């Protein structure tokens, strides 16, 4: 079973803004949340769900689905949007969520920081780069 598809950061924001049932799950590591920043949904009166897909040491979080189900019980009518650094880890998270009955599950293209540019830097695309709400902790 495949996830619902890829959406841009702007489409993710619109979905979250228009559907009060929609959930944003940030699957980056704790270090990324603390040192890079996080999406800010306070303007929508909601919180982001934070669950690591991989641990800081790069090992897969074997409890990901269990932790996800604790925060987002399986329903077939609640859109769940998965965000990582650049839109790669969140694909695996969206696939795992879909297999667990959490659907529709979407991957955010370009993630929070975007892909590397020709100079090896991130930040030219993604949630933060297009000016969507975010904060540093």
Language model segments and positions:
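Rhodanese-like catalytic fold shared by cysteine-dependent sulfurtransferases
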Residues: 1-23, 30-79, 90-137
């Amino acid at each position: 079973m495949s996830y619902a598809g890829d959406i841009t950061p702007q489409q993710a924001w619109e979905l979250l803004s228009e559907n009060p049932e929609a959930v944003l799950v940030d699957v980056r590591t704790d270090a990324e949340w603390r040192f890079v920043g996080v999406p800010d949904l306070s303007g929508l009166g909601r919180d982001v769900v934070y669950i690591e897909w991989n641990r800081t040491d790069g090992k897969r979080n074997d409890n990901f689905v269990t932790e996800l189900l604790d925060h987002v019980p399986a329903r077939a009518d609640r859109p769940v949007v998965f965000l990582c650094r650049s839109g790669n880890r969140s694909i695996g998270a969206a696939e795992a969520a879909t297999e667990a009955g959490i659907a529709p599950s979407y991957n955010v293209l370009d993630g929070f920081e975007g892909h590397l540019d020709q100079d090896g830097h991130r930040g030219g695309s993604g949630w933060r780069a297009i000016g969507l709400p975010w904060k540093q902790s």
